[in-house]
């Protein structure tokens, strides 16, 4: 009897799912691959969705639809359409889809990644906090961390041992986030495989992989409420890493509550406490916003540093040209300053080319359409509650905007702007920390090249590790040869 009930329920779900997917919804509905009941097109994504969706772009065009289970999903990789959606029609696309994984990751209704009206107040606070932070204080913080990174690398250069950048890049960006959010220093004398760094790196990596991959429970409507409860109480692989990082941040919150001087905020957490602590219901917003900034500010920038080292050892002629430009800019100085940026156009172009060829967040965070809308001069219909994915990798490989897109060619960004270059997103939900991230990238990239010739040790590197919210290369090593 029970078996028959489940069988009938299963058949009903398949039939209703098929009807929903195959029903024509609008005369200008988007094209896309044929979906199957329940799964939709999930089975076609494979283990490397960033490659799959770029291939689909070549078949179905710059905007197309997929069915992620029951979730109607729009994939866009055209800069004109992206700006029309997220700038001209910001109000319709400003919220996130209410999927269990992202709802859990956003702490329900809290933080910068939430999907309600409160995110605008939270985002404005964070933006104002970043503006109020002394430029000199930020620069001194960055300068100190760059110095420590170069010092660590010199130890490998002196001994001649091959150098692996991954953990050092994460320590560099984590140290900056520690100082900016918690006013806390990480000692560079600390063993990189132990202490605070090791305590956080592994769970943070797991979080980004889990958020990027998505699970079947996110996309089957009838399963979503049950899957959310599973994430909260049973899924140790997902809940465990979040719990580790949240406990870490909560401990800092308690320390700040006991030591805060409300008239002289030390860091971002003090500013958040000043803004939200009058309402106890908003304490989770303080914690979740700190978590969002901590995660976003670390992994994406660390990944870009890793990609930079990989691409430079692959292209010694480009590396040498950039070094000569940097050397001309700094003269006898032993370090590069942010004020040198206008004098290093080729290095600036290298940074853009790395972010184009290897976008660290291949899809960013998804958006949601609040209402039915037609875009592209009436050509493309997007239904209410669609999930919107910006295919940043597909955008960077769009031959309409980038000639020979598979080629690493920084010169494409010299003496001209390209409207298709948008690695930090556009509109009101673009990366809130893009200025800080850009400064981190410039100072780390330039000072690495000023000090070291990055040499290939002869071992081929396969491009990507396991797919996640951010993408990094598999671990690799380089030889560091002194430039002095």
From Swiss-Prot:
Keywords: Heme, Iron, Membrane, Metal-binding, Monooxygenase, Oxidoreductase, Transmembrane, Transmembrane helix. The keyword Membrane applies. It is found in: Membrane. It is a single-pass membrane protein. It holds the Pfam family p450. Belongs to the cytochrome P450 family. This is Probable cytochrome P450 508B1.
């Amino acid at each position: 009897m029970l078996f028959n009930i489940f069988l009938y329920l299963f058949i009903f779900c398949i039939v209703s799912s098929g009807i929903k997917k195959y029903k024509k919804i609008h005369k200008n509905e988007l094209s896309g691959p044929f979906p199957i009941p329940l799964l939709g097109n999930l089975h076609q994504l494979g283990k490397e969705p960033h490659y799959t969706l770029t291939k689909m772009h070549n078949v179905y065009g710059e905007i197309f639809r997929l069915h992620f289970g029951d979730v109607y999903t729009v994939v866009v990789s055209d800069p004109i359409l992206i700006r029309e959606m997220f700038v001209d029609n910001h109000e319709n696309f400003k919220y996130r889809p209410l999927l269990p994984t992202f709802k859990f990751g956003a702490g329900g209704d809290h933080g910068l990644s939430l999907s309600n009206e409160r995110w605008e107040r939270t985002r404005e606070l964070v933006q104002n906090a970043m503006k109020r932070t002394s430029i000199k204080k930020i620069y001194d913080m960055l300068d100190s961390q760059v110095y420590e990174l170069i010092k660590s690398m010199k130890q490998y250069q002196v001994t001649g041992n091959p150098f692996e950048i991954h953990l050092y890049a994460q320590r560099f960006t984590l140290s900056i986030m520690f100082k900016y959010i918690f006013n806390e220093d990480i000692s560079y004398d600390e063993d990189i495989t132990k202490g605070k760094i090791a305590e956080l790196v592994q769970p943070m990596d797991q979080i980004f992989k889990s958020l990027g991959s998505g699970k079947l429970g996110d996309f089957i409507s009838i399963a979503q409420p049950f899957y959310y409860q599973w994430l909260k109480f049973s899924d140790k692989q997902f809940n465990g890493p979040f719990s580790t990082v949240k406990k870490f941040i909560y401990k800092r919150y308690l320390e700040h509550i006991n030591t805060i001087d409300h008239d002289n905020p030390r860091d971002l957490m003090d500013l958040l406490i000043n803004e939200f602590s009058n309402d106890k219901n908003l304490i989770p917003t303080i914690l979740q916003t700190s978590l969002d900034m901590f995660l976003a500010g670390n992994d994406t920038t660390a990944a870009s540093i890793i990609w930079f080292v990989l691409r430079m050892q692959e292209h010694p002629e480009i590396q040498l040209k950039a070094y000569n430009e940097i050397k001309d800019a700094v003269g006898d100085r032993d370090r590069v300053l942010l004020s040198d940026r206008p004098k290093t156009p080729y290095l600036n172009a290298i940074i853009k080319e790395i972010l184009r060829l290897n976008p660290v967040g291949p899809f960013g965070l998804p958006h949601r359409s609040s209402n039915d809308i037609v875009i592209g001069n009436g050509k493309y219909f997007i239904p209410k509650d669609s999930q919107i994915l910006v295919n940043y990798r597909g955008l960077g490989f769009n031959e309409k905007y980038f000639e020979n897109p598979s080629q690493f060619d920084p010169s494409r960004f010299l003496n001209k702007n390209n409207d298709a270059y948008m690695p930090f997103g556009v509109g009101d939900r673009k990366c809130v920390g893009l200025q800080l991230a850009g400064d981190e990238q410039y100072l780390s990239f330039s000072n690495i090249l000023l000090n070291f010739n990055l040499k290939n040790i002869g071992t081929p590197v396969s491009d990507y590790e396991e797919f996640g919210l951010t993408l990094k290369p598999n671990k690799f090593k380089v030889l560091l040869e002194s430039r002095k």
